[in-house]
A protein has these predicted regions:
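Acidic/His/Gly-enriched intrinsically disordered linker/tail segments
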Residues: 99-111, 122, 139-259
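Juxtacatalytic substrate-recognition/specificity segment
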Residues: 27-145, 231-233
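Bacterial signal peptide processing site
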Residues: 23-25
Length: 259
């Protein structure tokens, strides 16, 4: 189905030499030897032999290559690194509490995630979210808030292969309007921590996706590194509108979004 489009994706080695001394702050735990690596242009994909991920590595790699290109273009990044994606067979194997989980390690341009059936939007979204953490942090440095760190990774989702980006976020905002926290609450790290995780992630992603679409990424880059207090103080001068006005404009847009 996509073999001709992936002539550049090659099996580099049957096994990967174990890596020692990796701390979780800088990369995945020390690797065992039971991996196969498939090399792409911008992504090296590590999979378990015979796994669901290996059976679908061409499409998974295609999604990540597209996401890499999209994120760099949207944020106008100079980043030209190479990602290392580790696909685990279960949350337990990756030391996560569920199968819907991943973790990024920007210092080593790597991330790990759980790849389980079905092949589709949820898996692509999870994988792309973690990849975006690496690309964004290595391209811009670390964000000043949880709001920006987690929200932007989903706000930047390319929809070439799925509809888990804007076509999900804006209708979700409309249907959950009564439960939405204020953006000022999410920008504050304390308020973020008191908000249900799913609501915090989706609300912030929706707002930031709209902000990029409406006002461009250059202004967003200015608020990206600011801490909670700085962002709340400076967002009006950077955007020419106070946060409350931006939030109201976003909600009207989502209410009228037709896809």
């Amino acid at each position: 189905m996509c073999g001709k489009r992936w002539v550049g994706l090659t099996l580099a080695a049957a096994t990967v030499v174990a890596v020692s001394g990796c701390h979780t702050a800088f990369g995945p735990e020390p690797l065992d030897r039971d991996w196969r690596v498939y090399e792409g242009v911008r992504v090296s994909f590590f999979v378990r032999p015979g796994s669901f991920a290996e059976q679908n590595v061409a499409r998974l790699s295609e999604v990540l290559e597209d996401q890499f290109t999209s994120t760099v273009a949207t944020l106008r990044l100079a980043y030209a690194g190479h990602l290392h994606a580790y696909a685990y067979n279960s949350g337990a194997e990756a030391h996560f509490t569920s199968d819907a989980a991943g973790r990024a390690y920007p210092e080593t341009e790597s991330f790990r995630f759980v790849a389980v059936p079905p092949m589709g939007d949820n898996l692509f979204q999870l994988m792309s979210h973690e990849a975006n953490h690496v690309v964004v942090i290595d391209g811009l440095g670390r964000a000043g808030t949880y709001f920006m760190t987690e929200g932007l990774a989903s706000a930047l989702l390319s929809e070439t292969f799925h509809r888990s980006g804007r076509h999900f976020l804006f209708p979700w905002t409309r249907s959950h309007r009564a439960q939405l926290p204020r953006m000022a609450t999410l920008i504050d790290d304390g308020g973020w921590g008191r908000t249900a995780q799913d609501t915090a992630y989706k609300s912030s992603a929706s707002f930031l996706a709209w902000l990029i679409d409406t006002y461009g990424s250059d202004r967003l880059r200015q608020i990206y590194p600011l801490n909670s207090d700085q962002m709340l103080d400076r967002i009006a001068s950077i955007y020419g509108r106070p946060l409350d006005a931006l939030e109201a404009e976003w909600l009207v847009f989502c209410e009228n979004f037709a896809g």
